[in-house]
Swiss-Prot record:
Span(s) of short sequence motif Interaction with polymerase core subunit RpoC: 464-467
GO function terms (MF aspect): DNA binding; sigma factor activity
Entry superkingdom: Bacteria
Any GO CC annotation of this UniProt entry: cytoplasm
Residues annotated to bind DNA: 634-653
Gene3D superfamilies attached to this UniProt entry: RNA Polymerase Primary Sigma Factor, Sigma-70 factor, region 1.1, Winged helix-like DNA-binding domain superfamily/Winged helix DNA-binding domain
Species this protein is from: Rhodobacter capsulatus (strain ATCC BAA-309 / NBRC 16581 / SB1003)
GO terms under biological process: DNA-templated transcription initiation
Region (Sigma-70 factor domain-4): 608-661
Protein name in UniProt: RNA polymerase sigma factor RpoD
Keywords, alphabetical: Cytoplasm, DNA-binding, Sigma factor, Transcription, Transcription regulation
Annotated stretches, region: Disordered: 214-252
Family: Belongs to the sigma-70 factor family. RpoD/SigA subfamily.
């Protein structure tokens, strides 16, 4: 269908956005025909038909979307394979052979357009099928489960969970700070029974779902809004953030209601975890004692019971669906302790190197015996000269390092080797989940661009919109649950929209206005537009306040805030030879009249003071700061003249009496009215 649209495009209508590029060109048709035969097209071929100088990044993205709809993949370079004779045989149409002397491969056209570079790199990642999305989602889930299982082997995790339970009971923290409310509440509604063993996704699978038919598919997709932007009376675009949030408020429970519904069950689960952990801690102590003491034993049956109890606790922790911030805090705690252990290990290895002990031999003897109290005695009894040297020269340092290691072991509650294994398991699960999330994000970058294009010309650059949309996409990947049966793109669309509209509301204005105030402004504008149609005129603030059931002062405040800033360089007049800034009073500038009066007062004062004796003139100038940076006290003036302060006071009084004489005062009296 897309190919037919391209072929039927008329020359006079194909270049609405850019007259220099015409989809009906023979070169474009030929390119599409060859691409259909091969099933792919290279970036080089696109660049040849659409030069960077004449085609915008958005047009390139539109063409790439059309090609994708036709089943044509956009790849970095030609798919080539090397023949036995050293030649490179191209697998494209015509089976042309390209002889190469050395390394083959054409250099891609270079461009400094960031949008074009981004689109080129994005085009190299293939789109995911529904099965591919499910496979990646399962990898993310498996990585998270591996990470949670590792955390559950650390006593520090259960100590933290016990603290969180106590803080919840004492209401020091909210339930939303401990668990992911939406994910936990969604699971409780869905009921995971019978869903764990699904190979494919049964039920309401929404393949190729259109947004207008997505009712009930995604949590936030119950009432899809139009993608077309709305404009106010002045032609300015209006953000629809508040509309979308109103929809969310009407269709979703509030966080407080979710907390009230989930808190009893969560506290019950936390109580079970605390009870089981108390048993597990006793078994861990016995297990650790058996590890440290050669005569200690931990039977096979006890080990089986230990593993069973640990598995039950892992299941309980998974049921909680802990908040990502809490999981990250636990991981950071583990990694911090691991860095401390590595620092101690490094100190021990340095001492061994100084004693010329083979590093591999030292590590073999050291690892696994970090908490063994007999290790130093056994190693010092070795006949090798290097070991004897180590304990002769550095025994105190070795004892200090092992004492630090013992403190760490006592704090973590498990053997150091076991702790290292726990950290490795957590790192492995985190790495697997992070890699799977990265693949999911990269495969859906096109979705971000298609949504970001609808929000251009709203105060943010296109690349900024893409960046904010990518942030929303990453949040969608974190929260996506493949078991619900809808496609990832359907769910991610709402996260991307919310991220973009939030950023526009937060960053687009020259003078930043908080998002909640933007929502109130939009609600006020929308109500005003509705009342304009009803009553045939602009509503007054009083009418708006009554309609919205909002205080009148708040309505006036919002209307004042809603005004758009105007540039001081705005042209004024028909000829536009002056700017708005030319007509605005500068409060800091001195008026010419005031400047003339000040200058005249200065000259008159100088002439009047000159009629006094030099001593009297200087005393008055110093006392009142005339012609100086500051005035002076009687004591300071007296020090200048080497007389007492009383004498200065007398001179000052005499000089002021002279100035009051009509022959002098009449010259200054006119300035008193100014």
């Amino acid at each position: 269908m897309a190919a037919k649209d391209i072929d039927d495009t008329k020359p006079d209508t194909a270049a609405d956005e850019d007259a220099s590029f015409d989809m009906s060109q023979a070169a474009v048709k030929r390119m599409i025909g060859e691409a259909k035969e091969r099933g792919y097209i290279t970036i080089d071929q696109l660049n040849a038909v659409m030069p960077p100088e004449t085609v915008s990044g958005e047009q390139i993205e539109d063409v790439m979307s059309m090609l994708s709809e036709m089943g044509i993949n956009v790849v970095e370079g030609e798919e080539v394979e090397e023949s036995e004779g050293g030649e490179v045989v191209e697998t494209g149409s015509g089976s042309r052979e390209i002889a190469v002397a050395g390394a083959a491969g054409e250099t891609l056209d270079r461009t400094d357009d960031p949008v074009r570079m981004y689109l080129r790199e994005m085009g190299s990642v293939e789109l995911l099928s529904r099965e591919g999305e499910i496979a990646i989602a399962k990898r993310i889930e498996a990585g998270r489960n591996t990470m949670i299982a590792g955390l559950c082997e650390s006593p520090l995790t259960f100590q933290a969970i016990t603290i969180w339970r106590d803080e919840l009971l004492s209401e020091e923290i909210l339930l939303r700070d401990v668990i992911d409310l939406e994910a936990t509440f969604g699971r409780s509604l869905d009921g995971d029974e019978g869903m764990e063993g699904m190979e494919g996704i049964e039920g309401p699978v929404v393949e190729g779902l259109d947004l207008e038919t997505a009712e009930g598919a995604a949590p936030a997709a119950r009432r899809p809004a139009s993608d077309e932007p709305e404009y106010d009376a002045d032609g300015n675009p209006i953000s629809r953030i508040d509309e979308e949030e109103d929809d969310d408020d009407s269709s979703n429970m509030s966080l407080a209601a979710m907390e009230a519904a989930l808190k009893p069950k969560v506290l019950e689960t936390l109580e079970l975890i605390a009870r089981d952990y108390a048993k597990l801690a006793e078994m861990q102590d016995l297990r650790m004692s058996a590890t440290l003491n050669e005569d200690g034993t931990f039977s096979v049956a006890e080990e089986a019971a230990y593993q069973k109890l640990r598995s039950e606790i892992v299941l309980l922790v998974n049921e909680l669906h802990l908040h990502n911030n809490r999981i990250e805090a636990l991981i950071d705690q583990l990694y911090g302790i691991n860095r401390k252990i590595m620092s101690i290990d490094s100190g021990m290895v340095k001492l061994a190197d100084a004693a010329r002990i083979n590093r591999r031999e030292f590590i073999d003897e050291y690892r696994g015996y970090e908490l063994d109290p007999t290790w130093m005695d056994r190693m010092s009894a070795k006949p090798a000269r290097a070991w004897v040297t180590l304990f002769e020269k550095s025994r105190d340092k070795v004892e200090d390092l092992r004492h630090e290691m013992a403190q760490v072991g006592q704090y973590v509650g498990v053997d150091i080797s076991e702790f290292r294994r726990i950290v490795n398991q957590v790192q492995k699960g985190e790495k697997e989940a992070r890699q799977a999330k990265k693949e999911m994000v990269e495969a859906n970058l096109r979705l971000v661009i298609s949504i970001a294009k609808k929000y251009t010309n709203r105060g943010l650059q296109f690349l900024d919109l893409i960046q904010e949309g990518n942030i929303g996409l990453m949040k969608a990947v974190d929260k996506f649950e493949y078991r619900r049966g809808y496609k990832f793109s359907t769910y991610a669309t709402w996260w991307i929209r919310q991220a973009i509209t939030r950023s526009i509301a937060d960053q687009a204005r020259t003078i930043r206005i908080p998002v909640h105030m933007i929502e109130t402004i939009n609600k006020l504008v929308r109500t005003g537009r509705q009342m304009l149609h009803e009553i045939g005129r602009e509503p007054t603030p009083e009418e708006l306040a009554e309609k919205l059931q909002m205080p009148l002062e708040k309505v006036r405040k919002v209307m004042k805030i809603a005004k758009e800033p105007i540039s001081l360089e705005t042209p004024i007049g028909d000829e536009e030879d002056s700017q708005l800034g030319d007509f605005i009073e500068d409060k800091n500038a001195i008026l010419p009249l005031d400047s003339a009066i000040q200058e005249n007062l200065k000259e008159t004062t100088t002439r009047v003071l000159a009629s006094l004796t030099p001593r009297e003139e200087r005393v008055l100038r110093m006392r009142f700061g005339i012609g100086m940076n500051t005035d002076h006290t009687l004591e300071e003036v007296g020090q200048q003249f080497s007389v007492t302060r009383e004498r200065i006071r007398q001179i000052e009084a005499k000089a002021l009496r002279k100035l009051k004489h009509p022959s002098r005062s009449r010259k200054l009296r006119s300035f008193l009215d100014q």
